[in-house]
Amino acid sequence: MYGLFFEVKPKDGHLKNYLSEVDYLNPILSKYPGLTWIDRFSNLSDKDFLLSFQIWDSEESILSWRQDPEHQKAQMKGKKLHFDDYRIRVGKKVVKYESKKFSYFDEEKRKLESKYIVLINSTNELQDTSFTSFKSINREHAFTAMASTLDFESASKLISNFATLDAIVDATIYEVLRDYSMDDRDQSPN
């Protein structure tokens, strides 16, 4: 499984336009092969940023969605009209903590010196300076906290520090495969 993390800062006065584009694309996206889950979140420490978090079954599915003609039109509108900034990260799920147990994926392939995203889903805001906290736009009492690390050991420690809290629903570590932004396109697939 793969996580796609799209953090976006709409230009002043363009939030409604961006959300209209999202509403238009949602029916297309929901039928797209490979998408297993999506939610959008408001950033609790920086109200100007939103997070779209998606779970896909493969990188190929993500790339296919990226090439969708309607999605490409919306991407161009976003870049030219609606966005001050954005960042996209794609990561492969390597650890999942749920129901008080850890599940590991592709252990032998994991790079110890790589970037990782730690994502903790909870029913309350996680207040820790290691994380950026978000609140779901679509679901009540649904929060996610996201942290970035430069190695697997640090990512594992972050999960271990918070996994036993009552409000934690689950936690996941993603190994970052691509990380690019509006101005830094080096790791963009095209």
Put a short name on every predicted segment.
Residues S52-F53:
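Conserved hydrophobic/aromatic residues on the N-lobe beta-strands of protein kinase domains
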